Amino acid sequence: MLADTLKAIAGQRLVDTDGDVTHLELLPPATEQQVRALEAKLPGPLPDEIRSALAVTTGFANGPLESFALLDLEGFGLDDAFPHPYSIAHDGYGNYWILDVLPGATDWGPVFFACHDPAVIAYQAPSIEQFVKDVVAMAPDDSRSPINRVHETVVHTLWRDQSALIRQPAAAASSDPTLREFAECLTPDAVIADLRDPRPGSGFAWGMYGPRTDIQRFGTHRLWALLRPAAKPGFFSRMFRK
């Protein structure tokens, strides 16, 4: 359980790649008011695991990352891809580790890394508990760290190599009924990212067509379509339209 893991790592000795030593400190538990405020803005129930963890702490007072918190750090956008994102960690450079909270869900996994440069969503861990274990297991800038691998390597691989994306015609002919139904709603130029069963190294370049990439999600399924943005009319086109 996440609460047990948080209790176990309190005071853990952390050594960074420069050899500097710190001891992990936890923030105080959440107050009843904080828990009620959190519940009020969620699209579904607060999972028992998170409630128990909040009774231990709201996050890290120090530690390897810029921040880690169980009370939604907020500040993350990209609502087309994640209608109910829940930010749990930040790297200090505008990138977040988030949860894709689904209405009615009682399990808040997996954890995704949302990067803006390159503009990529990458799978990080199956659960918050595993993410926490990975964060404190070794320095995040250690090349052996799962955190470092996603932060420094996987995002660039996903940006360059988009072979895992499914083209609309192939998806429309798929034996997977959910994938096929989604594809039938899309134009032939669309490509689809399927993260319903994410594995290490999986993800997609949400900005593959630039900052105006058209992102469409298929309901609560972890299926996203990426399309080129509609072309803006040129100056003369706008002028003669008047």
Predicted regions and their residues:
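A surface-exposed partner-binding patch
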Residues: M1-T106, Q162-K242
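Short acidic-hydrophobic sequence patches enriched in Asp/Glu that either
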Residues: S127, V154, G219
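Charged, amphipathic alpha-helical linkers/stalks
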Residues: V150-L158
